[in-house]
UniProtKB/Swiss-Prot annotation:
It comes from Homo sapiens. Keywords: Acetylation, Activator, Coiled coil, Nucleus, Transcription, Transcription regulation. Belongs to the Mediator complex subunit 30 family. The keyword Transcription regulation applies. The lineage of its organism: Eukaryota, Metazoa, Chordata, Craniata, Vertebrata. GO terms for cellular component: core mediator complex; mediator complex; nucleoplasm; nucleus; ubiquitin ligase complex. This is Mediator of RNA polymerase II transcription subunit 30. It comes from the Eukaryota.
Length: 178
């Protein structure tokens, strides 16, 4: 459902209006589509909240006189928000369809294979035996690096304490000299 970008009315097409620009506009990155979809969902939530706010603030015609101008203004805002909400849902449907079209050739990977397990049970499948070892090796390496980092920090602290004491002694000698 991609269409080439249209030039603004009354403006000449820019230098990028050639076939390459149109081809680039047609080939939209799936991640960009997902971002657009996320923004569209956020807009839908915002518009829905506005609709509920308008409905909450509207007075019911229960025999009380109300300003018809205010009522008409709120009614037009409500209708406008409903129209925009409908447009946003259509846009979200287009983005969803395009994402499914782009990801149609991909083989879905089971979630269990994406999560590295730490357990070393014999009951698990052999094809998942690699990730637990990788996760445990990575944790061991991180622990070693953290241990070395703590040792270096301790050494630096000792050096700073020694320098502080040395500066204190020098300042004391200079003070006694004067």
């Amino acid at each position: 459902m991609s269409t080439p970008p249209l030039a603004a009315s009354g403006m000449a097409p820019g230098p990028f209006a050639g076939p390459q620009a149109q081809q680039a506009a047609r080939e939209v990155n799936t991640a960009s589509l997902c971002r657009i979809g996320q923004e569209t969902v956020q807009d839908i939530v915002y518009r829905t909240m506005e609709i509920f706010q308008l409905l909450r603030n509207m007075q019911l015609p229960n025999g009380v006189t109300y300003h018809t101008g205010t009522y008409q203004d709120r009614l037009t805002k409500l209708q406008d928000n409903l129209r925009q909400l409908s447009v946003l849902f259509r846009k979200l449907r287009l983005v969803y369809d395009k994402c499914n079209e782009n990801c149609g050739g991909m083989d879905p990977i089971p979630v269990e294979q994406l999560i590295p397990y730490v357990e070393e049970d014999g009951s698990k499948n052999d094809d998942r035996a690699g990730p637990p070892r990788f996760a445990s090796e990575e944790r061991r390496e991180i622990a070693e690096v953290n241990k070395k980092l703590k040792q270096k920090n301790q050494q630096l602290k000792q050096i700073m304490d020694q320098l502080r004491n040395l500066i204190w002694d020098i300042n004391a000698m200079l003070a006694m000299r004067n």
